[in-house]
């Protein structure tokens, strides 16, 4: 399975999350996952909430259209983006 896959209603991303980073960014490929650095600490769901907000902004969708399907409590996550309006260049390179 690759880091980014298209599905009927959007994209499925396999992510490796780096919490407490200096800035929010999509870093690149990390093994068979997409590495995302976020500034929030991994405490009380803050990192998950921040990740959803960051991805919603990157793909220009509502936060309700970003679903964490797997990995709620770990660094390895599977996230579904429903009907993305924009695809960031780091992700677009992997979908081709």
Swiss-Prot record:
<comment type="similarity">
    <text>Belongs to the UPF0235 family.</text>
</comment>
<dbReference type="GO" id="GO:0005737">
    <property type="term" value="C:cytoplasm"/>
</dbReference>
<protein>
    <recommendedName>
        <fullName>UPF0235 protein KPN78578_33230</fullName>
    </recommendedName>
</protein>
<dbReference type="Pfam" id="PF02594">
    <property type="entry name" value="DUF167"/>
</dbReference>
<dbReference type="InterPro" id="IPR003746">
    <property type="entry name" value="DUF167"/>
</dbReference>
<dbReference type="InterPro" id="IPR036591">
    <property type="entry name" value="YggU-like_sf"/>
</dbReference>
């Amino acid at each position: 399975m690759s880091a980014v896959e298209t599905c009927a209603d959007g994209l499925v991303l396999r992510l490796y999350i780096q919490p407490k980073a200096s800035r929010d960014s999509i870093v690149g490929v990390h093994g068979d996952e997409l590495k995302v650095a976020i500034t929030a600490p991994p405490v009380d769901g803050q990192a998950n909430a921040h990740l959803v907000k960051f991805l919603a902004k990157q793909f220009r969708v509502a936060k309700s259209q970003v679903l964490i399907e797997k990995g709620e409590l770990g660094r390895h996550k599977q996230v579904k983006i429903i009907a993305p309006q924009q695809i960031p260049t780091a992700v677009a390179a992997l979908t081709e």
